[in-house]
């Protein structure tokens, strides 16, 4: 215990001496080019047309998250209708635009042909039939080749996610695991080590993020990152998703953040995904309103949630990033997606920026 206390004290001194790490504010805008191609107009709070990236910059954003799928052409039609289209060419073009606009880049690699999340982490079609070592080799080769392609185009991400919401593993069924136990972590960590090795080789200055989504479950979160520590996984930042409809209350999130700071003081934490509803119109997830008793499903409820979340995060010095997921949703007069999620930061009917955008910008 004394050795651990001394280590934490020395680490704190080092942080003071070197200055606090930079804080990132931004969003995952991976569908923005598709909306723009459909003729979608984005507007500021007063209804005046805007260029989205310039507006985000004006609102204090300094980073953008871009997702990358392996071969989205193999995605089921239902997922294509949800906006799955981000192959390497798409991600590269958007990333170049992001960097040219002066933002730092978080590249979010989904090791799947479509959505990778707690309920699905399916192996890319072209990797099916591989054994666990062949899958690890594929992770390494794909990560390395993708980063090399981006680097040749002059794009080096400041941050790279090796996997997306991989609480339950990745590359199912081979890499599936129970995050509350120990089984499966050896295979998962071999996959992670392969991806991280490629990141270190091609983009040695990039920060590596390992992203899970059980922000409201401390026991699972603790066990998960302890298992990674035991296996010497090489990463820099703990990434969490936090959605109020799935992950508990904001005070509960605060306890998780405090505990992470105590147990993993060397690892900054980022909320790499958050969002909240302002409506349920045309929403395929409309049943996800079990949190309405805390935050009404309304513009005011979304604003209240954002204000309270930012207030909580600003209390935690170990939290160095906050990203809104799908802020660019703007569905009026287009069919970019089949339904509306109504969790973005622009009104689906008017294209106007929502008040939650102002509250979001208070993360400091």
Tell what function each PLM region has:
Residues 20-55:
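Boundary/entry segment of secreted carbohydrate-active catalytic domains
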Residues 35-36, 40-47, 71-75, 81-89, ...:
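Acidic-and-aromatic substrate-binding clefts and catalytic sites of carbohydrate-active enzymes
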Residues 10-18:
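Hydrophobic h-region of N-terminal signal peptides that target proteins for export
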Residues 46, 50-53, 186, 197, ...:
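Glycoside hydrolase catalytic-domain groove-lining segments
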Residues 25-29, 64-66, 105-109, 158-162, ...:
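Hydrophobic faces of well-ordered beta-strands that scaffold small-molecule active sites
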Residues 2-9:
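Sec-dependent signal peptide recognition
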Residues 57-207, 211-213:
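Substrate-binding cleft and catalytic face of glycoside hydrolase catalytic domains
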Residues 259-266, 279-312, 316-364:
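Aromatic-rich peripheral "rim/lid" segments of glycoside hydrolase catalytic domains that contact
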């Amino acid at each position: 215990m004394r050795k651990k206390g001394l280590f934490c004290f020395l680490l704190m001194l080092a942080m003071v001496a070197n200055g606090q790490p930079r804080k990132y504010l931004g969003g995952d805008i991976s569908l923005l080019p598709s909306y723009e191609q459909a003729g979608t107009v984005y507007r500021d709070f007063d209804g005046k047309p805007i260029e989205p990236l310039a507006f985000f910059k004006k609102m204090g954003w300094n980073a953008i998250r871009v997702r990358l799928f392996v071969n989205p052409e193999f995605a089921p039609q239902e997922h294509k209708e949800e906006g799955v289209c981000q192959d390497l060419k798409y991600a590269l073009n958007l990333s170049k635009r992001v960097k040219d606009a002066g933002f730092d880049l978080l590249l979010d690699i989904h090791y799947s042909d479509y959505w990778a999340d707690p309920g699905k982490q399916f192996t890319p079609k072209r990797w099916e039939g591989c054994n666990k070592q062949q899958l690890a080799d594929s992770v390494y080769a794909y990560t390395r080749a993708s980063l090399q392609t981006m680097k040749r185009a002059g794009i080096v991400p400041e941050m790279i996610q090796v996997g997306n919401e991989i609480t339950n593993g990745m590359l199912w069924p081979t890499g599936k695991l129970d995050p509350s136990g120990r089984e499966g972590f050896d295979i998962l960590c071999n996959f992670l080590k392969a991806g991280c090795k490629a990141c270190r080789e091609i983009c040695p200055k990039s920060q590596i993020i390992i992203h899970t989504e059980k922000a409201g479950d401390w026991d699972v979160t603790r066990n998960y990152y302890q298992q990674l520590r035991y296996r010497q996984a090489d990463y820099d930042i703990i990434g969490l998703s936090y959605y109020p409809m799935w992950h508990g209350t904001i005070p509960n999130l605060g306890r998780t953040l405090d505990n992470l700071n105590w147990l993993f003081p060397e690892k900054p934490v980022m909320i790499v995904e958050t969002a909240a509803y302002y409506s349920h119109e045309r929403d395929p997830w409309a049943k996800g309103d079990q949190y309405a008793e805390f935050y009404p499903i309304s513009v005011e409820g979304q604003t209240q949630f954002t204000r309270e979340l930012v207030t909580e995060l600003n209390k935690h010095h170990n939290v160095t990033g906050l990203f809104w997921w799908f802020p660019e949703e703007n569905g009026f007069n287009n069919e970019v997606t089949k339904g509306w999620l109504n969790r973005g930061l622009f009104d689906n009917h008017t294209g106007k920026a929502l008040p939650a955008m102002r509250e979001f910008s208070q993360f400091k």
